[in-house]
Amino acid sequence: VLSFSWLQNTKATKEGINLSNNSFLFISAWDDSIIKKIVSGILDDPTMFCGIKVSGVQIANTPDFKNSTSFLMASPVLLKWRDNGALRYVTIEDEDFEEKLNINFKNKLQNAGLDTEGIKISIDPNSTYRQTKMVTYNGIKNRTSLVPIVIEGTTEQISFAWSVGLGNSTGIGFGALK
């Protein structure tokens, strides 16, 4: 299970995305061996997509998080939910966004063999920033959300969230935290 951000420090134009010398993205994973494989692949071939080449790699340790930590989204959260067999996209416009986000994350914790007790994810009450965004991936339109959040729990639970991201499809660039 891993997470990666969208490109940061870029400028969108009609012609496409312009990168600068300080543009970057980050990749995080709960299992360090995944990061080692990714870094090895980048070092073998630094070409990414659309002619972008990696010019440097920095490896950082997981920060020491407090039992309540605020995060911004480095990529929008994709949250899909099945209601009576029908798939729906849950966004910040839905009353049950926080509830479904918590259930989704508790499932990730449980699947990783980690404790789910005491974890709580909520929209940051000190921020008025809220945005929904339609993101097309492989021809599929996905309704996503960008919103500052607060995660309360153990340092292990919060570190796990930071490492694997929130919501669905974190391995293809959704739900990364910064």
Please give the residue ranges for each predicted region.
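RNA-interacting cores
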Residues: 1-178
